[in-house]
Amino acid sequence: LVTLRYDVTPELFLYLFFICILYLISITDIYDQMIPDSALLIAVIVRLLWFFVTEPFGWRGLLGLIGNGLSVSLPLLLLVLLMEKIRDMEMMGGGDIKLLFVMGLYIGWANNLLALFLGCLTAIIYGSLKQRKEGKEVYIPFGPFLSLGAVFALLIGDGLIQWYLSLFI
């Protein structure tokens, strides 16, 4: 599907790498309840190297790239810290916030916001069904749902966002 969306272009290889990282993160989160910092760091390094090789925009472009990473992850981090202080319990793991930063580097802020929405929606549906089946509170690893949202946003996010905005313009 990614090849159909991006054809055989240099970006295809970047996005295939990104999907492999998301797969690794998802499997690790499912089995170990953690998102490995090493996978996130490798993804950041590859994306920065890709930027410096392919983007001629210099510092302004680099600030835009970093802004894409921070635009969703930083406000969510602040919200999570506030909610954890109010509720006195862990609301979301730090790996999920870092994953959102990395996702923003690859798919941009708008698609990252879409991926977060889709990740939350699918996690809520899955968690509700699992809790109903088991009859008790259940642990839901969020990384796989964020990854699913990121792949969906990578494939059709731009078109979906354009369509949504056209409803208001």
What is the role of each PLM region?
Residues 14-124, 163-169:
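Functional transmembrane core segments of multi-pass inner-membrane proteins
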Residues 94-95, 130-152:
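Interfacial loop-to-transmembrane junctions
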Residues 1-9, 166-169:
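N-terminal transmembrane signal-anchor/hairpin module of polytopic inner-membrane proteins
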Residues 148-169:
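C-terminal domain-closing interface element
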Residues 119, 124, 128-132, 151-158:
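Hydrophobic alpha-helical segments
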